[in-house]
């Protein structure tokens, strides 16, 4: 009997306007009404994941940043996993040497060196998911995140680790050259302390090896006393 469902967000729970569809809201509520716990499991940071949920009356736990951060329904942090200096250096050196653009995700925000490039990337993500990208809405959302401080524009990423309390949780890399980015991803994945995944063709999501959705989902199931045979990890609800 299914007791726990994990659902992704981009290209599944969300539409092209980055909103939770009415159909998916109703599906989540139906599952919850029948005693099933629904968890959002996403590569997004919490402040990105919670924004579309806040526009609804849903209450759900979150697995964020591919498992680097887990929060309960009341937003309390249950667990975190970050990248130390040596791992960050290993990742960024590989990306820079191959001229691959990337963003840095921390416990406090997302760092970018080029918001215009971010716009093109988010449009590409939507289109690769088979959606028609709402360019104006995506552009406005980027500006809104810059204004509220969750997207931080910097000249370079070198000083992030020097900020007190700032922990690097994930590196998100993009490149249109699929062969190149696949090669770099395979090289980084050979490190026993790194987990490398991809949410769409042309990107890499790099976290600590302890930060994986499957690990986080297993931990939530254990906490709730749910056997893994009663868990579904789905791309949509």
Which residue stretches match the model-derived regions?
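Non-catalytic pre-domain segments flanking phosphatase-related domains
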Residues: 1-7, 222, 226
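Asp-based phosphoryl-transfer active-site loop
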Residues: 3-17, 91
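Hydrophobic "anchor" residues on beta-strands that sit immediately upstream
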Residues: 4, 61, 232
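Conserved functional loop/turn residues at catalytic and ligand-binding sites
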Residues: 8, 13, 35, 195, ...
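Short alpha-helical
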Residues: 19, 47-48, 179, 212
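Active-site phosphate-binding/coordination module
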Residues: 22-132
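Conserved acidic, metal-coordinating active-site core of Asp-based
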Residues: 108-232
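Conserved small/polar residues in nucleotide/adenosyl-binding loops
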Residues: 237
């Amino acid at each position: 009997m299914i007791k726990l469902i994990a659902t992704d967000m981009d290209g599944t729970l969300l539409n092209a306007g980055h909103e939770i569809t009415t159909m998916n809201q109703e599906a989540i509520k139906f599952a919850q009404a029948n005693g099933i716990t629904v968890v959002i499991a996403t590569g997004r940071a919490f402040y990105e994941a919670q924004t579309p949920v806040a526009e609804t009356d849903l209450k759900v736990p979150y697995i964020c940043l591919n498992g680097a951060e887990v929060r309960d329904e009341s937003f309390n942090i249950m667990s975190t996993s970050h990248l130390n200096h040596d791992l960050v250096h290993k990742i960024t050196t590989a990306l820079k040497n191959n001229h691959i653009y990337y963003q840095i995700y921390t416990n406090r925000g997302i760092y970018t060196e080029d918001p215009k490039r971010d716009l093109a990337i988010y449009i590409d993500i939507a289109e690769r998911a088979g959606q028609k990208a709402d360019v104006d809405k995506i552009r406005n959302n980027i500006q809104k995140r810059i204004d509220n401080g969750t997207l931080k524009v910097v000249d370079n990423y070198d000083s992030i680790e020097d900020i007190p309390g700032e922990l690097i949780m994930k590196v998100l890399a993009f490149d249109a050259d699929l062969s190149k980015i696949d090669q770099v991803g395979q090289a980084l994945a050979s490190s026993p302390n790194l987990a490398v995944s991809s949410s769409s063709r042309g990107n890499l999501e790099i976290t600590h090896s302890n930060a994986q959705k499957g690990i986080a989902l297993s931990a939530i199931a254990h906490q709730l006393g749910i056997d893994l045979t009663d868990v579904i990890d789905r791309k949509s609800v």
